[in-house]
């Protein structure tokens, strides 16, 4: 008995017999359900960050390079899934995250006026290359290499922001809710990857996500306290 690719027969059979499903039956089911929950949650994961920027009309403390690299990483991941003909449940999360990441970068550019001419080279280059990558019209070997590099891209997408936070002793307009959801999502992906026996490279990527998102989340908690104290003192 399958629902959305989830085999429910094992769990339903156990419950009909008045028994609680065994671990080997329950864990894969939980893994699949969590995977679909992540796809649903990805629709809103970056909205708190976008809303915070628009509300405050400020991008103080945000590293534009970090968010640009996120766009590149999501584009490569989505293109690879489309190229392999995977079902929407496998790449839907990346599609929603890419759309939100593009809106987020656009907001950063808008509230960073005037944007240097050299900065515009990066989005123009992306617009020129992204359609070709998403259409899968590149050398297969290069495609595999790009996909293999995505974990490094996501790692380097976080490092500039972590360093900027440390240097400024402030997280500026970073959204706690967005990075909390990123952190929680990475933990869930580690669990689902272990259950589905994903390749070690994929598991490593999600583990790095736990570390980097956890680092930024910790910085938000640490550096927001002095800022709140200063604001209270000023009042």
UniProtKB/Swiss-Prot annotation:
GO terms for cellular component: membrane. Residues 27-93, 150-205 form the PQ-loop domain. It is a multi-pass membrane protein. Keywords: Membrane, Repeat, Transmembrane, Transmembrane helix, Transport. The chain crosses the membrane at residues 25-45, 62-82, 88-108, 123-143, 174-194, 202-222. It is found in: Membrane. Pfam families: PQ-loop. It comes from the Eukaryota. InterPro entries: MannP-dilichol_defect-1, PQ-loop_rpt. SMART domains: CTNS (SM00679). Its main location: membrane. Required for normal utilization of mannose-dolichol phosphate (Dol-P-Man) in the synthesis of N-linked and O-linked oligosaccharides and GPI anchors. Belongs to the MPDU1 (TC 2.A.43.3) family. PANTHER family: MANNOSE-P-DOLICHOL UTILIZATION DEFECT 1 LEC35 -RELATED, MANNOSE-P-DOLICHOL UTILIZATION DEFECT 1 PROTEIN. This is Mannose-P-dolichol utilization defect 1 protein homolog 2.
């Amino acid at each position: 008995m399958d629902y959305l690719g989830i085999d429910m027969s094992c769990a339903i059979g156990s419950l009909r017999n008045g028994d609680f499903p065994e671990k080997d039956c329950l864990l894969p089911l939980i893994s699949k359900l969590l995977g679909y929950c992540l796809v649903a949650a990805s629709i809103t994961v970056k909205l708190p960050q976008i809303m915070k920027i628009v509300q405050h009309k400020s991008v103080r403390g945000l590293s534009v390079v970090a968010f640009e690299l996120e766009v590149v990483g999501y584009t490569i991941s989505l293109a690879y899934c489309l190229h392999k003909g995977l079902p929407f449940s496998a790449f839907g999360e990346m599609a929603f995250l890419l759309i939100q990441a593009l809106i987020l970068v656009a907001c950063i550019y808008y509230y960073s006026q005037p944007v240097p001419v050299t900065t515009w080279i990066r989005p123009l280059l992306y617009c020129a290359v992204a359609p070709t990558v998403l259409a899968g019209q590149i050398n297969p070997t290069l495609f595999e290499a790009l996909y293999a590099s995505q974990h490094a891209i996501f790692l380097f997408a976080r490092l500039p922001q972590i360093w900027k936070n440390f240097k400024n002793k402030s997280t500026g307009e970073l959204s706690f809710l967005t990075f909390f959801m990123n952190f929680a999502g990475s933990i869930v992906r580690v669990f689902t990857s272990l259950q589905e026996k994903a390749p070690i490279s994929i598991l490593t990527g999600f583990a790095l996500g736990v570390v980097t998102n956890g680092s930024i989340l910790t910085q938000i908690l640490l550096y927001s306290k002095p800022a709140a104290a200063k604001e209270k003192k000023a009042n």
